[in-house]
Swiss-Prot record:
Protein family according to the UniProt entry: Belongs to the neurotoxin 30 (phrixotoxin) family.
Role played: Probable ion channel inhibitor.
One term under GO cellular component: extracellular region
Subcellular compartments: Secreted
Keyword terms, alphabetized: Disulfide bond, Ion channel impairing toxin, Knottin, Secreted, Signal, Toxin
Disulfide bonds: 55-69, 62-74, 68-78
Protein name: Kappa-theraphotoxin-Cg2b
UniProt note on tissues of expression: Expressed by the venom gland.
Amino acid sequence: MKGSAFAIILGLVVLCACSFAEDEQDQFASPNELLRSMFLESRHELIPEVEGRYCQKWMWTCDSERKCCEGYVCELWCKYNMG
């Protein structure tokens, strides 16, 4: 009785693990897709300025060297200027 209950529980665990793995494969076409999406999202955080330097957007640390983009204010990190 204990052996069959263990086999049923083990079967359910394997079934859940397999379905989870299929969901993950559907979400990302390749293993590198997650890294690629992370870099594509962060790539837009830096915008070139006229002087060839880059300005910082929201949640990037800022100081006298690393200026915030237009419309953002520096308060340890760049925050959107609400007005």
